[in-house]
C-alpha cells in the first residue's frame, strides 16, 4: 500500500472524514459527482460540518486530491464506495447510488484492485448486485 492510491467514492458524511483520515498516511483521491461540493471542499468549506477548515486544508492539495473526473481514479488500487442508500416511499432501499457508483468504479478497475462497500445495504447486495456489475463492465473494457 505504500505507493498505492486510495479512491473514496462519495464525499458526504462518511466519505469525507474517511478520505481525510486515510490522507494522513496515504495518497487519496476523493471522487464525488457534485461539482459544487468539490469546489466548496477545495476552498476548505464543508457544509456538512463534519470537518473544520483546518482539517481540510491540512490534507487537500498534498495527500488528498478532490475530483469529479472519473479517470482521475485510474491511479487507485483500492476503492471505497461511501454513497448513500436512501429509502423509497415504500420503505425499500434505493440502490441506485450504489449501482451508479459500482458502474463508475468498474470503468477504472484493474486486475488486482480492491473494492470496499461502506454504504449501508442489506446482506447480499455486494455479491448479488455489485459483483455482477463489476464482472459485466470489467469484461467490456
How should each PLM-predicted stretch be described?
Residues 11:
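Glycine-rich Rossmann-fold phosphate-binding loop(s) that bind the pyrophosphate
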Residues 2-5, 27, 33-78, 84-92, ...:
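Conserved N-terminal Rossmann-fold NAD(P) cofactor-binding segment
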Amino acid at each position: 500500500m505504500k505507493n498505492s492510491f486510495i479512491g473514496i467514492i462519495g464525499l458526504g458524511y462518511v466519505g469525507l472524514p474517511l478520505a481525510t483520515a486515510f490522507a494522513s498516511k496515504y495518497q487519496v483521491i476523493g471522487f464525488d459527482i457534485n461539482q459544487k461540493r468539490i469546489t466548496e471542499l477545495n476552498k476548505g468549506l464543508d457544509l456538512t460540518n463534519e470537518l473544520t477548515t483546518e482539517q481540510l486544508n491540512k490534507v487537500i492539495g498534498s495527500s488528498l486530491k478532490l475530483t469529479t473526473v472519473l479517470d482521475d481514479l485510474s491511479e487507485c488500487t483500492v476503492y471505497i464506495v461511501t454513497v448513500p442508500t436512501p429509502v423509497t416511499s415504500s420503505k425499500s432501499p434505493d440502490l441506485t447510488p450504489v449501482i451508479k457508483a459500482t458502474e463508475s468504479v468498474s470503468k477504472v478497475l484493474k486486475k488486482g484492485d480492491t473494492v470496499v462497500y461502506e454504504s449501508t445495504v442489506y446482506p447480499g447486495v455486494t455479491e448479488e448486485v455489485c459483483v455482477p456489475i463489476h464482472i459485466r463492465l470489467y469484461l467490456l473494457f
